[in-house]
A protein has these predicted regions:
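Positively charged n-region of N-terminal signal peptides that target proteins for export
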Residues: 1-4
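N-terminal mature-domain "stem" immediately C-terminal to a signal peptide or N-terminal signal-anchor/transmembrane
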Residues: 24-74
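Outer-membrane beta-barrel translocator/channel fold
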Residues: 238-243
């Protein structure tokens, strides 16, 4: 009986310790939980703008801000979150968003990740006109040709950066990463250690083996977090996400785009400015 009582007491102790540890773990997790805003409130947009203006040209940030405001107003804040909250992958009412946009903007399809990233960085990074194949940028070209977002010379630099480049026929992402490093090194992306262009690079072999920046955004350092700025697609909203570390942002992006591959191509990979980012997730 005494042994049973001792055993019972130990079990209670173990369970209570487990609950306590779980509680501590939950508290620690909550401290680093990512939060997201669509910048549809004045407060959140001001917060993001102030962060960006620490590192980027004021006129570029102002132009970006006007694009955010125009998009959010056009879709009447449908499905948008003003304040930062833990839901970083929300569901959007795309049918309503598309109807509102088309009814007010007509044939202008709006802007995407590449256009908004370039707007923010265009007067901070370098410029180099190199031969390009912008076949995969048909929608980007339509958006830029039907707006005054970029000047003719800025368009040329945009196409030079984001058009697809040739690579080798291999599934080795490191080979492709080196090719992309060589390409992006032309544009002086490392102009400030506290802000960077982060890209998701896709390997395609439909016409020939090539690399294409399928998604891109800007990552800025704050005192206790990193702020990630992205426009998901032409139709989808802007998102500003706070991550505890750079690695959290990189993993979020890889997890989102990891299936953009085929049996004959490499998995997507992440670039920070002109450097390949190594992730354990590549091995899975």
């Amino acid at each position: 009986m005494k042994k049973i009582l001792i055993l019972f007491t130990c079990l209670i102790f173990l369970v209570s310790c487990g609950n306590k540890n779980d509680a501590v773990k939950d508290i620690a997790t909550n401290k680093t939980e990512p939060t997201m805003s669509n910048m549809s409130s004045k407060e959140s947009l001001v917060e993001v703008t102030e962060t960006l203006k620490k590192y980027l040209k004021e006129e570029d940030v102002d132009q970006f801000t006007s694009l955010v405001e125009d998009y959010n107003e056009t879709i009447e804040n449908t499905s948008l979150h003003g304040d930062f909250n833990p839901e970083i992958n929300p569901e959007y009412d795309f049918e309503k968003i598309d109807k509102l946009w088309t009814s007010k903007k007509g044939e202008f399809i709006g802007t995407n990740c590449r256009i908004n990233t370039f707007v923010l960085l265009k007067n901070s990074i370098g410029s180099k006109n190199i031969p390009y194949d912008n076949e995969d940028l048909a929608f980007d070209m339509s958006a830029l040709d039907n707006s005054k977002i970029l000047s003719d010379s800025e368009k040329e630099n945009f196409y030079s950066i984001f058009s697809k480049i040739k690579t080798e026929k291999t599934k080795d992402y490191k080979v492709h990463g080196k090719k992309m490093e060589e390409h992006l090194s032309n544009f002086n992306l490392n102009f400030n250690k506290d802000i960077s262009m982060v890209s998701v690079v896709i390997h395609d072999d439909l016409d020939y083996d090539s690399l294409f920046i399928g998604h891109v955004g800007v990552l800025a350092k704050e005192e206790d977090h990193y702020l990630w700025i992205e426009k998901i697609s032409f139709q989808e909203p802007y998102q500003a996400i706070k991550f505890a570390t750079k690695e959290d942002c990189f993993k979020y992006l890889y997890d989102k785009y990891k299936d953009y591959k085929s049996e004959t191509t490499s998995h997507p990979f992440i670039m920070e400015n002109d450097k390949l980012v190594e992730l354990d997730e590549y091995k899975n």
